[in-house]
């Protein structure tokens, strides 16, 4: 704790910054700061050190060439990942501002200097929850080159073969020509296209998250949240199947019009443990009564 001269200062500054950041639920990124600033800011952060991780992150990240062990540390050069994961702001320090400018793409605009941090706003930010026009299958996705897969994921949703059969009717198969045009310029256009269909409201809750959207047609709504069997999704109050997409994230089918979406999380096994507990309770009471 005391071995790094500025560690305590950065964490104290982060607590102050938490009160000064704009309202809303979105992700942040950091550059050359100490680990886990997101915990102090109460924000999901791309740069994270911890021994626990959602299992599906261990398939999603490696498919993009991002190492995930006890640390998540996507390189700044993987710019498209920031749009895909709804990163709105990046934090760095005054000491590393010049180095950040040298490495960053042109999509970051200076926002402010607050509480010891220099903030940059992502000009290609896409709010949490958005739809696509195209899809491709996991087999097609795995045939593409790894370095530009993040760009591809801003253009098309990756479905399993089974889900492509069941849900492909709501999307168009990605044309072959679109597999190759993966430039930064096209990325900015893809972000604009995704932003046009993004949720109008997104809020983290104590049990998961809530979102609202208005769609001109039935479509799959994508959320860059790791897939987990503990989630239950409700669209307009009706329980809805959750699809595992992009080799580890989630999507749900939404009808045309105004929709409300709620994801509620219970750790896998909780329901079973409650049943077992209730079944065992009479036996326990008999046991206690016998020896009373």
Whereabouts are the PLM-identified features?
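Active-site-proximal, structured, solvent-exposed surfaces of multi-pass membrane proteins
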Residues: 172-292
